[in-house]
Amino acid sequence: MDVVEVAGSWWAQEREDIIMKYEKGHRAGLPEDKGPKPFRSYNNNVDHLGIVHETELPPLTAREAKQIRREISRKSKWVDMLGDWEKYKSSRKLIDRAYKGMPMNIRGPMWSVLLNTEEMKMKNPGRYQIMKEKGKRSSEHIQRIDRDVSGTLRKHIFFRDRYGTKQRELLHILLAYEEYNPEVGYCRDLSHIAALFLLYLPEEDAFWALVQLLASERHSLQGFHSPNGGTVQGLQDQQEHVVATSQPKTMGHQDKKDLCGQCSPLGCLIRILIDGISLGLTLRLWDVYLVEGEQALMPITRIAFKVQQKRLTKTSRCGPWARFCNRFVDTWARDEDTVLKHLRASMKKLTRKQGDLPPPAKPEQGSSASRPVPASRGGKTLCKGDRQAPPGPPARFPRPIWSASPPRAPRSSTPCPGGAVREDTYPVGTQGVPSPALAQGGPQGSWRFLQWNSMPRLPTDLDVEGPWFRHYDFRQSCWVRAISQEDQLAPCWQAEHPAERVRSAFAAPSTDSDQGTPFRARDEQQCAPTSGPCLCGLHLESSQFPPGF
């Protein structure tokens, strides 16, 4: 038996052992001579969200009791909207009530309607069971999935028991999705998203909700996990413009310290929305995100920059975004209603200025080809290693704002080595005048709204008790993988300047490639288990949990 066969049999046995532990339940791995686990009542230690606390919860305050009464009174309004969904699905009243908060026992049916899970179940009868069984037999990332499942929402009463019912359902969903969508495969963030769905939806409904969330153009979440991250790039470019307009001092400090816009916190925004804040606020922000779509991402990021403005202006270059991810959590360490009120105001302001979404992408955007480097803002200090676009004739028009840029028509195209083509684009009607921003890119896909239909039902209603607490704390450290912009521009620039290409052949050899080799090897080694980059190149180390988890 050769080495390949031995390794294959070992992986198969390891996969079977993991599946068997989940089939046995929460007693898996314990000695057989141990008696039954003593029953422990959590009645006085579980808050209204299902978070288990170490000590008994204090009595309800007057403010908390008022919030509970308000949530109960809103329940009838949401039931009426679900009963007449065709009338309310595109109404302003739905958005207004989403910002005020969904009642807990309405959240499951509303999420199911927003993501249209019932229609997907009807169109694909029995497919989830098939994908789940295939994942059990052939999953390549089952060890990683098992490790992430063990650390997902461990302070929630549903996921507290190792190899318990909800952990088994979460494992099945992730295995099935790995088979259902090989382009995404498995990323660590999917376990947290699926766990949120499992709080209010049954297993199969939670699977189709995850499928719809990543497949919907309205939410554009697959761009954060798929290899072609055009959505992420467009949102980052738009964020750079919005933050520079609303907080010029903050962006000026970033430019001064060589903090590139590509290192912005938008890449880790989804993770922070999942496990960086209290569960109560997480659910309310996800309510808004499911109703509003990707329009909600930019206002949330803008609020975070605004609240953290003083800290950001004091951030040095040494590990800035690793510390920012931890400080970003302090943005939401406040009353839920206050955060949602500021979020609504920011949403209205950006919508009025048409800055809530990036402009539509060009046909070539979103592919695996390298993106052209956007022209720098006025007064911006380029990051080390960056190079401006080749010099051209002086521009006669100021650079248009993203939200109001005129339509552009291609003037000429320049073939580049490797088959890529770069187009010099100009505003329509000014084909003879070069534009100051050459071939600026945007995200992939169109940002149009999708109509909802279908009507589901469900899920469970938890007991209403004390205040919410943070469900767990992470010790996060991250490193950011940046794409060399010199490598992007050099082939196209040399195609237009053959003389410079000849001179560069006799120039002293650069040491950039030698220096970048170990970093590329480290990138490939860190990202090898996944079939796509995790949150636009942001790698987060494993979470640290107390002993016994």
Swiss-Prot record:
One CC-aspect GO term? plasma membrane
> What membrane topology is annotated for this entry?
Lipid-anchor
Q: Which PROSITE patterns match?
A: TBC_RABGAP
Record's compositionally biased regions (Low complexity): 398-417
Domain spans labelled Rab-GAP TBC: 101-293
Q: Which InterPro entries match?
A: Rab-GAP-TBC_dom, Rab-GAP_TBC_sf, Rab_GAP_TBC_domain
Residues bearing a lipid moiety (S-palmitoyl cysteine): 318, 325
Query: Per the record, which residues fall in region Disordered?
Result: 350-443, 507-526
Tell me the keywords, alphabetical order: Cell membrane, GTPase activation, Lipoprotein, Membrane, Palmitate, Ubl conjugation
Q: How is it modified after translation?
A: Ubiquitinated by a CUL7-based E3 ligase, which leads to proteasomal degradation.
Q: Name one GO molecular function term.
A: GTPase activator activity
Q: Where in the cell is it found?
A: Cell membrane
Among Pfam families, the record links this protein to: RabGAP-TBC (PF00566)
Purpose of the protein: Acts as a GTPase activating protein for RAB5. Does not act on RAB4 or RAB11.
Anything else known: TBC1D3 is encoded by a collection of very similar paralogs with multiple copies of each paralog, some human genomes encoding well over 50 copies depending on ethnic origin of the donor.
Quote the protein name from its UniProt record: TBC1 domain family member 3I
